[in-house]
Design a protein with these regions (language model features):
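Short, well-formed alpha-helical segments that are part of the catalytic scaffolds
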Residues: 5-21
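Acidic donor-binding segment of Leloir-type glycosyltransferases
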Residues: 16-49, 59
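Glycine-rich, basic loop-to-helix element that forms the pyrophosphate-binding segment
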Residues: 47-64, 74
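Short aromatic/hydrophobic "clamp" motif used to bind/position activated sugar donors
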Residues: 69
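Conserved donor NDP-sugar-binding/catalytic core segment of glycosyltransferases
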Residues: 76-119, 123
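Short, flexible, basic/aromatic active-site loop/helix in glycosyltransferases
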Residues: 119-142, 158
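A short, conserved alpha-helix in the catalytic core of glycosyltransferases
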Residues: 143-194
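Active-site-adjacent helix/loop segment of glycosyltransferases
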Residues: 183-298, 311
Length: 325
């Protein structure tokens, strides 16, 4: 079990309470409170400094010899039997990653995520958010697993290269899921693995918007094939212009521009990262297309009026271009 903690407060203590009896590694990414001293009595604690989520996860993975790596956020409460259910699902050789059913901690009759969803533009959000918890009753394939609570086989984690540390924060789980799909593995959500998550849907702050947007573009540029990028170019451009307008209205256009500037400055790294990612590919775009949706969910994203028309246009475009995949 690997928990990456950053100023997690009492949430970390609550999380460790739910993991009693498990072999837990806590990566201290910047915690300074009494929760770290408490964690040291119940888990192996590694002081990493604020190296970012992905780097913290990679460090934690190196500190455990387990064949199955289970990652949970410090703001989760893992229910009895969840870890065993995740491990059982990974016994299927074609399954690489398994997400737990995530319920809202403060409204446990509702889902936080039944598997995360990816738009053709790379925008992503927790699927099933707010739905009744019993709406997820059977394991199923998903686009990618939420980083809040998931398991992956160690050999697959190594094969995929672990988390990309350059992302630093946000979208690491999205990229890992895409690399698993490129390699031909399946990604599942398993309702028998039950986890509560202290998640609140709210508008991101400016710094979070920077990482979300920059990293979304890193994933799109590295994971999509050239053909898919060309076919989706009008959609990607329209979404990018729309997001720039939203950023201007909401006051985070500077952060949006910082993301573009980072990509330009680091274009050599991005090209190298794309080559490494595409080298994993064992399946074609037709197989991957089923994990992309052309419909933006207005419940999850703060979208302008007219989104229904945009969804209709993008859906029509996606239906048309998929025949060329």
């Amino acid at each position: 079990m690997i928990v990456v903690a950053y100023d997690s407060g009492d949430a970390l203590t609550r999380c460790l309470d739910s993991l009693a009896g498990e072999d837990v590694v806590v990566v201290n990414n910047g915690g300074r409170g009494s929760e770290i001293a408490d964690a040291e009595t119940r888990a192996r604690v590694i002081g990493a400094g604020n190296v970012g989520f992905g780097a913290g996860c990679n460090l934690g993975a190196r500190e455990t010899a387990a064949d199955v790596l289970v990652f949970v956020n410090p703001d989760t409460v893992v229910q009895p039997g969840a870890v065993a259910a995740l491990a059982r699902a990974l016994e299927q050789p074609d399954v690489a990653i398994v997400q737990a059913r995530l319920r809202l901690l403060h409204d446990p009759e509702r889902l936080n995520s039944s598997g995360n969803v990816v738009h053709v533009s790379g925008l992503a959000w927790p699927g099933g958010y707010g739905d009744p918890a019993d709406a997820l009753s059977e394991p199923r394939e998903i686009a990618y697993a939420s980083g809040a609570a998931f398991a992956i086989r160690r050999d697959v984690f190594r094969e995929l290269g672990g988390f990309t540390e350059e992302l630093f924060l946000y979208q690491e789980d999205l990229e890992l899921g895409w690399r698993a799909h490129l390699r031909g593995f399946r990604v599942l959500v398993v309702p028998e693995a039950d986890v509560l998550h202290d998640y609140v849907l709210e508008r991101p702050g400016r710094q979070k918007e920077y990482y979300l947007e920059r990293n979304r573009l890193i994933v799109v540029c590295s994971a999509y094939s050239r053909r898919l990028l060309w076919l989706l170019a009008p959609v990607l451009l329209a979404v990018e212009l729309g997001l720039a307008l939203i950023a201007w209205r909401q006051g985070w256009l500077r952060e949006k521009a910082r993301g573009w500037a980072w990509l330009v400055r680091n274009r050599a790294w991005l090209a190298s990262h794309r080559r490494e990612t595409q080298a994993l590919r064992r399946v074609d775009d037709r197989d991957l297309a089923r994990f992309l949706t052309p419909v933006l969910d207005p419940r999850m994203l703060e979208l302008p009026s007219g989104i229904a028309a945009l969804n209709a246009l993008v859906s029509a475009w996606w239906r048309g271009v998929r025949v060329f995949l």
